[in-house]
């Protein structure tokens, strides 16, 4: 499994308001869902604008291991997927939650044994919810966390299962994505506190329906907290992948914290991506946010204001929002995100520790963070092998001299070349002749 370098990266301070146009690669969440659906489809399909990152490459490698043909065409971001008989093999999940939670249902359909493992940090991530659910649907599985083994029998009965998905919406999405291939489909009932990151389940449902799969949800008159996928074919669909809006948030934040202006092209008019919520968040913090055709532009205020916000549905934006809050002019309260303690790291503890180590004033609450602005100083910002922790440190570094980020390379999980994109954004800003006033 992969060993990462723990070298330090000097986060550049913005010497001028950040003014740039930043084109982002495709969405990880959409790419990996599209790969699963294409692998189970009734014919070949093409994905255009697919993200190529560690997480998506792990998914591609895993599907190839299981017998799916995946080739590049006209560049790495165009993928041709040819379904085939599923077979056994060894799957490396790395740190990719979408691989370790979306692939086991596929493996249960394979005609052989599939062994799963991942990075050391991944072995603490909760997986028993989806593995126990699969057992209840007829799968033969050894283990409750990485490493574990799925003994595929070539088919899976399916049926009804009750789970507690309050720890991650991926438990629901993972079961739904493959369910049309189960003999009885699947009915997933959630019994627990509110499911986090509901937009990701909406994304899964939308993509299933685009593939001709019949899905019943609470929003369409189905049973409360219950999702039903009927058995049947998955239609092959050629897809154009949207830019990754969650990755875009760090670049838009750069405009917000430097009184600058950043434009992201091809921002979708309608989307299920949680990253779209950054528009309302930045507006609430005093930024100007506007659309011009397919472009989204953020213009930063003279001073960001604090925010009191429930991030339960968009928890992956928490590191970006915490970095913004640490540079605002008043206190912020980030709520509804207790589930982040089970992500790549305990993101709440990590954010509190790293901001406080720079002189900040952050307190963990039962379900979030209270952030009171303070004069920050330079120091080492640990990434915890967490891509969003690394980009949060880069945002803080725009305003604070001497920030050194440990293992910036972890951003390759969802955004390879982040450092170059960041440097290009800042070099474009240097040519504007504007001076920083923060």
UniProtKB/Swiss-Prot annotation:
NCBIfam families: aroA (TIGR01356). It is found in: Cytoplasm. Pathway: Metabolic intermediate biosynthesis; chorismate biosynthesis; chorismate from D-erythrose 4-phosphate and phosphoenolpyruvate: step 6/7. One of its GO terms (molecular function) is 3-phosphoshikimate 1-carboxyvinyltransferase activity. One of its GO terms (biological process) is aromatic amino acid family biosynthetic process. The keyword NAD does not apply. The lineage of its organism: Bacteria, Bacillati, Actinomycetota, Actinomycetes, Mycobacteriales. It catalyses: 3-phosphoshikimate + phosphoenolpyruvate = 5-O-(1-carboxyvinyl)-3-phosphoshikimate + phosphate. This is 3-phosphoshikimate 1-carboxyvinyltransferase. 3-phosphoshikimate binds at residues 28-29, 33, 168-170, 316, 343. Pfam families: EPSP_synthase. Phosphoenolpyruvate binds at residues 28, 97, 125, 170, 347, 388, 413. Its main location: cytoplasm. One of its GO terms (cellular component) is cytoplasm. The active site is at 316 (proton acceptor). SUPFAM superfamilies: EPT/RTPC-like (SSF55205).
């Amino acid at each position: 499994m992969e060993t990462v370098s723990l070298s330090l990266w000097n986060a550049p301070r913005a010497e001028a308001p950040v003014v740039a146009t930043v084109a982002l690669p495709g969405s990880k969440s959409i790419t990996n869902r599209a790969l699963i659906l294409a692998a189970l489809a009734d014919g070949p399909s093409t994905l255009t604008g697919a993200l190529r990152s560690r997480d998506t490459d792990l998914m591609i490698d895993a599907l190839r291991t299981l017998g799916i043909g995946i080739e590049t065409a006209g560049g790495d971001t165009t993928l041709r997927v040819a379904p085939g008989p599923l077979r056994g093999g060894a799957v490396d999940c790395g740190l990719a939650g979408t691989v370790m939670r979306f692939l086991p249902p596929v493996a249960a359909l394979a005609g052989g044994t599939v062994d799963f493992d991942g990075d050391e940090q991944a072995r603490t991530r909760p997986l028993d919810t989806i593995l126990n659910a699969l057992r209840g649907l007829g799968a033969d599985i050894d283990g409750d966390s990485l490493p574990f083994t799925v003994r595929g029998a070539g088919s899976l009965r399916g049926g009804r299962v009750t789970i507690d998905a309050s720890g991650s919406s991926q438990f629901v999405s993972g079961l739904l994505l493959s369910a049309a291939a189960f003999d009885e489909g699947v009915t997933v009932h959630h019994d627990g506190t509110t499911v986090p990151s509901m937009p990701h389940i909406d994304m899964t449902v939308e993509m299933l329906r685009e593939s001709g799969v019949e899905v019943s949800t609470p929003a369409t008159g189905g049973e409360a907290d219950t999702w039903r996928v009927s058995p049947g074919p998955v239609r092959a669909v050629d897809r154009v992948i949207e830019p990754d809006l969650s990755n875009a948030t760090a670049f838009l934040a750069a405009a917000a914290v430097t009184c600058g202006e950043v434009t992201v092209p091809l921002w979708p008019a309608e989307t299920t991506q949680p990253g779209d919520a950054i528009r309302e968040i930045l507006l609430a913090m005093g930024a100007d946010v506007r659309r011009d055709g397919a472009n989204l532009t953020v213009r930063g205020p003279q001073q960001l204001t604090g925010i009191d916000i429930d991030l339960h549905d968009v928890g992956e934006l928490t590191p970006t929002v915490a970095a913004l809050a640490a540079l605002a002019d008043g206190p912020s309260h980030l709520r509804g995100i207790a589930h982040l303690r089970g992500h790549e790291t305990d993101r709440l503890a990590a954010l509190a520790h790293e901001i406080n180590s720079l002189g900040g004033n952050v307190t963990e609450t039962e379900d979030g963070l209270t952030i009171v602005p303070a004069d920050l100083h330079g120091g080492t910002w640990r990434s915890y092998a967490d891509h969003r922790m690394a980009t949060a440190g880069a945002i803080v570094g725009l305003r604070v001299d001497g920030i050194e980020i440990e293992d910036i390379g972890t951003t390759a999980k969802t955004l390879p070349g982040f450092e170059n994109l960041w440097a290009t954004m800042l070099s474009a800003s240097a040519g504007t002749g504007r001076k920083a006033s923060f």
